[in-house]
Design a protein with these regions (language model features):
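Proteins with a high burden of low-complexity, intrinsically disordered sequence enriched in S/T/G/P/A and R
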Residues: 14, 39, 123-124
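Gly/Thr-rich phosphate-binding beta-strand-loop-beta motif of the actin/hexokinase/Hsp70
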Residues: 1-20
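Conserved DEDDh/DEDDy metal-dependent 3′-5′ exonuclease domain
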Residues: 2, 20-109
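Acidic, Mg2+-coordinating catalytic module of metal-dependent nucleases/exonucleases
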Residues: 47, 101, 106-150
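Acidic active-site catalytic centers that drive phospho-/nucleotidyl reactions
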Residues: 6, 95, 146
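Glutamate identity and glutamate-enriched acidic tracts
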Residues: 8, 35, 39, 73, ...
Length: 150
């Protein structure tokens, strides 16, 4: 079965949202060490947007139990252009970004071209403290929307 997914990383919070074709969702968070994540994705094909260049690297470290702070360091390296070398991850994934034209549009541009709402989060990715409950809910909703658009 295919699972669509997206990851968000903040200095004190990191999580991944999965959805199946019927939009059933599952959230894994660093606060519980991503407990159950490996078992949940076992045998599934993961589908993301630009995941070959970002999410797959982060997900591999989530599976190793990295903390939000460690994931944020990796996140910043990747965003800064220092992408880790790809290796054989313990999961199978497909990247919908690879099916897009060479202009390399971002997911938000594609959403706009499809006439979809462009949802942004007001929670800054460099938030210098743990998220408040309402910020966490907003960030998860933002992540889940990106999974839907993938």
């Amino acid at each position: 079965m295919n699972l669509f997914y997206d990851i968000e990383v903040y200095p004190f919070d990191a999580f991944v949202v999965f959805k199946d074709i019927d939009k059933n969702s599952k959230l894994f968070h660093d606060k519980n060490g991503f407990e159950g994540l490996a078992e949940f994705i076992k045998g599934h094909t993961l589908i993301g947007y630009n995941n070959y260049f970002y999410d797959d690297h982060i997900l591999a470290k989530m599976l190793q139990g990295w903390s939000a702070a460690q994931l944020k360091e990796l996140n910043d390296l990747i965003i800064g252009g220092n992408r880790p070398k790809a290796y054989n991850y313990p999961f199978k994934s497909l990247d919908t970004f690879q099916q897009i034209d060479v202009a390399m549009p971002g997911l938000k541009k594609i959403e706009g071209n499809m006439g979809k709402m462009i949802l942004e989060s007001s929670v800054p990715f460099d938030l210098p403290r743990p998220m408040k409950r309402d910020e966490y809910k907003e960030a998860v909703a933002y992540c889940a929307y990106d999974v839907d658009m993938t």
